[in-house]
UniProtKB/Swiss-Prot annotation:
Function summary: May play a role in immune regulation through regulation of the macrophage function. May also play a role in trafficking of proteins via its interaction with unc119 family cargo adapters. May play a role in ciliary membrane localization.
InterPro entries to which the protein is assigned, alphabetical: UNC119-bd
One of the record's GO cellular component terms: ciliary transition zone
Gene behind this protein: macir
Biased composition regions of type Polar residues, renumbered to the chain: 8-25
Protein family membership: Belongs to the UNC119-binding protein family.
Name of the protein this chain belongs to: Macrophage immunometabolism regulator
Length: 205
């Protein structure tokens, strides 16, 4: 006698088990496997609704009851006649869709273009103003600001060109006698590099 894992006799239950195993394998003719999908090739019904025709994988229309026969006859007659009106209608739909999409694309490009440019080119346009920008904004007409970085404030003010803040340039060793010398020095510092050696070479010669 064969005993199952659960302790039940296998000989007694062998025949019903085969019957139970064979019953679900038989397909039910009333309920096909893919009847839930609208595109079922077996039956084109969705819970009592019959689909008239499908277009581009979208459900176009469906009806029930007595209207189905009339619409089926109409569809049969339209299928027999050469379908010239349908392609024309579809081409019109495609053209209108293309023009609409191009219009939307143009509008999007117009709307988002100023915001997309900084992300592509870099962060220069969205850069926060620094202290050097403030210094340049004080004298925007000066042409030297494109040559090098911002100059210290003591150089921008002509009266204080000989102040102690220029010690890092070693300019305190120079003997400035006249105001014309200060103007020349300021001009040289603005239009040349901020190296004291070149200033000394210019003044010594």
């Amino acid at each position: 006698m064969e005993v199952d894992i659960n302790g039940v006799n296998r000989t007694n239950n062998s025949v019903p088990s085969t019957a139970e195993g064979s019953s679900p394998s038989k397909p039910d003719p009333e309920k096909p496997r893919c009847s839930s999908t609208p595109c079922s090739p077996i039956r084109r019904t969705v819970s009592g609704y019959q689909i008239l025709h499908m277009d581009a994988n979208f459900l176009v229309g469906f009806t029930t009851g007595g209207e189905l026969l009339k619409l089926a006859q109409k569809c049969a007659t339209t299928e027999e006649t050469p379908g010239e009106s349908l392609p024309a209608f579809r081409s019109k739909q495609l053209e209108s869709g293309l023009s609409r999409s191009s219009r939307i694309y143009k509008a999007r490009g117009r709307q988002f273009q100023p915001y997309d440019i900084p992300a592509v080119n870099g962060r220069r346009r969205r850069r926060m103003p620094s202290s050097g920008d403030k210094c340049n904004k004080a004298v925007p007409y000066e042409p030297y600001k494109a040559a090098h970085g911002p100059l210290p404030l003591c150089l921008l003010k002509g009266k204080r060109a000989h102040s102690k803040s220029l010690d890092y340039l070693n300019l305190d060793k120079m003997n400035i006698k006249e105001s014309a010398d200060t103007e020349v020095l300021q001009y040289q510092l603005q239009h040349l590099t901020l190296r004291g050696d070149r200033v000394f070479a210019r003044n010594n010669t």
